[in-house]
Amino acid sequence: MSNSHYNNYQQQQPHSSNGDPEYQHQQMVHQPQRFSNGHGMKTVAVPDMCLFCFEVLDCELNNVDGPSVPVFSNDAYPLFVTWKIGRDKRLRGCIGTFSAMELHHGLREYALTSAFKDSRFAPISRDELPRLTVSVSILQNFEEAQGHLDWQLGVHGIRIEFLTERGCKRTATYLPQVATEQGWDQLQTIDSLLRKGGYRAAITPETRKSIKLTRYRSQEIQMHYKEYREYQERRAQFGKVQC
């Protein structure tokens, strides 16, 4: 993993007006990918969600009317939309919300917000579209942990609340896949998340024990632009098709 990719995950996230952060953090159409952390939960994440996010971004970049109302569930969930680019899938934008949003509106909003308003990156351009992969993460099963190590790598996403060295309350999160993608253990993940949230002092065992940690699970579905275009071509040839 390159240092630039590592550093992208550590940068401070922008905050909403109420003081709570809006957390910035390839899958074939026919065989959707779901991470093991989604096992045991009602299936929510489906390939149509990735198709919809690509359609929303494609229409916006080409200045045409957006897609029609999607056919997948419109139940309300916390969600994240992540854009990555290139064969090595470098992070290109990732923003989501812990507030439950109806999926049709939420995915439309965060497909664009993560593409254009992630402060770590320049807005995604039309030339980049063919190299993109989109990931949709649907968050469920939030639980207050009994300590900073009361969660499992590769299973849980974590959200921490803590006080900075100046006594300011901060929050930060990593989705379940981040730690395993980076090759971190639990302590490395906690320390990186503290830095991401703006903690600048030395991190001690007491610092880690003082945080409030909430764990959650996520269903993630991914799709590359190539699969999106294949779907578009089939639809143009045969009319509406199911994934």
From Swiss-Prot:
Region called Disordered, residue ranges: 1-30
The AMMECR1 domain, residue ranges: 38-232
Biased composition (Low complexity): 1-18
InterPro entries associated with the record: AMMECR1 (IPR023473), AMMECR1_dom_sf (IPR036071), AMMECR1_domain (IPR002733), AMMECR1_N (IPR027485)
UniProt-listed PROSITE patterns: AMMECR1
SUPFAM superfamilies: AMMECR1-like (SSF143447)
PANTHER family in UniProt: AMME SYNDROME CANDIDATE GENE 1 PROTEIN, AMMECR1 HOMOLOG
UniProt-recorded name of the protein: Uncharacterized protein CG5902
Species per Swiss-Prot/TrEMBL record: Drosophila melanogaster (Fruit fly)
